[in-house]
A protein has these predicted regions:
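Conserved nucleotide-sugar donor-binding catalytic segment
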Residues: 1-85
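C-terminal subregions of glycosyltransferases and related glycan-biosynthesis enzymes
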Residues: 50, 57, 62-135
Length: 135
């Protein structure tokens, strides 16, 4: 099970380096999404994370539940899809925006996005080990 922060403050801090929500179980008010500018495909493969950062920036109150709401299997190709030059480039562009938007510091960018980019270009077998350790 992927552990995510529960409180609003912890979610905000965690979101500076990693996505603070488990995607399939997210619920939100339509008005909160609209206030943040809606769903945009600006950062390929990071569309949801991009929306959630913008929602947090507009003051949207967020909370995770401690309960497991959904069990998911990891498809065999997931670790391959989370790597490569295109994924790394998109991830770096997204995290650079997070920094430029004022949500994070340059230190957060350097200690979050840069190591993540190394994981992206690592061989799939190494990436799988790292993802399993983090989740």
């Amino acid at each position: 099970n992927r552990e995510v922060p529960l409180s609003y403050n912890d979610i905000g801090e965690f979101s500076k380096k990693r996505c603070p929500f488990n995607h399939p179980c997210v619920m939100f008010k339509k008005t909160a999404v609209e206030k943040a500018g809606g769903y945009k495909e600006t950062y390929h493969l990071f569309e949801d994370y991009y929306l959630w950062i913008r929602m947090l920036q507009t003051g949207c109150q967020a909370q995770n539940l401690p309960d497991v709401l959904l069990y998911m299997r990891t498809p065999n190709d997931m670790y391959k899809r989370r790597g490569g030059k295109e994924y790394a480039t998109s991830m770096l562009r997204f995290h650079w925006w997070v920094y430029k938007s004022g949500w994070t510091s340059l230190l957060d960018f350097c200690t979050g996005a840069l190591p993540h980019s190394l994981v992206c270009v690592a061989p799939t077998t190494i990436r799988k080990i790292i993802y399993k350790a983090l989740h």
